[in-house]
UniProtKB/Swiss-Prot annotation:
It comes from Capsicum frutescens. It catalyses: IMP + L-aspartate + GTP = N(6)-(1,2-dicarboxyethyl)-AMP + GDP + phosphate + 2 H(+). It comes from the Eukaryota. Residues 1-56 form a transit peptide. Substrate binds at T382, T383, T384, G385, R386, P387, R388. GO terms for cellular component: chloroplast. Plays an important role in the de novo pathway and in the salvage pathway of purine nucleotide biosynthesis. Catalyzes the first committed step in the biosynthesis of AMP from IMP. The gene is PURA1. CDD domains: AdSS (cd03108). This is Adenylosuccinate synthetase 1, chloroplastic. One of its GO terms (molecular function) is GTP binding. Its EC number is 6.3.4.4. Belongs to the adenylosuccinate synthetase family. Its cofactor is Mg(2+).
Amino acid sequence: MNISILRLDSNPITTATSPATATANHRSGILGCYNGTYSCRLNQLQQRKKNPSIIVCSTTKPLASVVDRHGVSESGLSRIESLSQVSGVLGCQWGDEGKGKLVDILAKHFDIVARCQGGANAGHTIYNSEGKKFALHLVPSGILNEETVCVIGNGVVVHLPGLFKEIDGLESNGVSCQGRILVSDRAHLLFDFHQEIDGLREAELAKSFIGTTKRGIGPCYSSKVIRNGIRVSDLRHMDTFPQKLDRLLSDAAARFPGFKYGPEMLREEVERYKKFAERLEPFITDTVHFMNDAISQKKKILVEGGQATMLDIDFGTYPFVTSSSPSAGGICTGLGIAPRVVGDLVGVVKAYTTRVGSGPFPTEIMGKGGDLLRFAGQEFGTTTGRPRRCGWLDIVALRYCCQINGFASLNLTKLDVLSDLSEIQLGVTYRHPDGSILNSFPSDLRLLEQLKVEYEVLRGWQSDISSIRKYSDLPKSAREYVERIEELVGVPIHYIGIGPGRDALIYK
């Protein structure tokens, strides 16, 4: 879509210009090894590294002159191999930043890819070597790399029907999952009724609704916190499972009159989960033991974050947040590993900002401008299909995320989406209604709705950059945009996304 004719104003209140910038103010398993030794699976990892059977490459030939067997340039390979033994990829905005693609690329150079929090509300879209699209919600994005073991950690809430649907879809397309997906025995089970009461809860809130994905994430974490939740390990004890499920369903019926529960529902669910338990058994693993054993054996581990810091239960725009910790702290609590072993964290941020659902959005572009940016970037939720709200890159929020997580570097995604614009704005400062500057990202939602955003306006490049693979080949204005972001947040940008394909990535 050509959006070059549009100057995407954020409804400025006042505008001032200077030679360089203009500012505007805006309201803004181990398979079968769970009861034995974990070294068997780790040894298999080493053998796979020695005997790779498939070369995965992009459908588009990279322009770099020297590439490894996965289509990564020599400079890119050097950048990836410099990452620490335990590294992580986390979102810097309100989710949907494109984390899955980077994880998919990095996974080829790691032994293990692990999810530590969230559930099926995390939607990651990745592509295989034939360009086929996969939308994953529970299975880590590293699954397309057959040498990688994927771990679903104790901090994840697992909806078994959804997990099996993803596994079936992957295997029907030739992606082997047996022995490659390990599900923590400590992870909590998310039931269909959690999804039902998620909708009932939203209906209760009426106009104050949070805008959840209605995947049952919040209700499941609520069950966990009030200590009547059911864990994966409970599937091994079908003698007590019915009583635990009855208590859980009875509590839900007592709280929500609209939720109809009776003996027949319990019988049906118990029979259903007996079958699920049998199928899941080969995947169930003490992942805390597995992860720490892998660390001691110097295996490389990549942590794939779901959602993003601005949706964190503690640091996000509460209550318009998720129910877990998608920031750095969630890695340790969601996998059972020590803080001292966690090394490089890469923050993923779009070249602009999007948000799904309700909640403050200081740099949102209202009206036609937001609609055009949404269609140019195909901004529709992977999990829900809902249109995402769109706006300019919020430097204040990004700097806040960098402070919380201590990112070693950033991955700037979807830079190509801005290619048709004649000018691009960066939200660089928050001001109180009286004009005074806020020195931090506020927790007060009323203040977030009232504050004014000061923008810098940079020149656009108005040319197609999707085939470029070297940073120096980007138009000058595109490089100035990247470098201005680095300057404002104080964190280097090492990866730049310029398209959806696996190879559409610039290593800086």
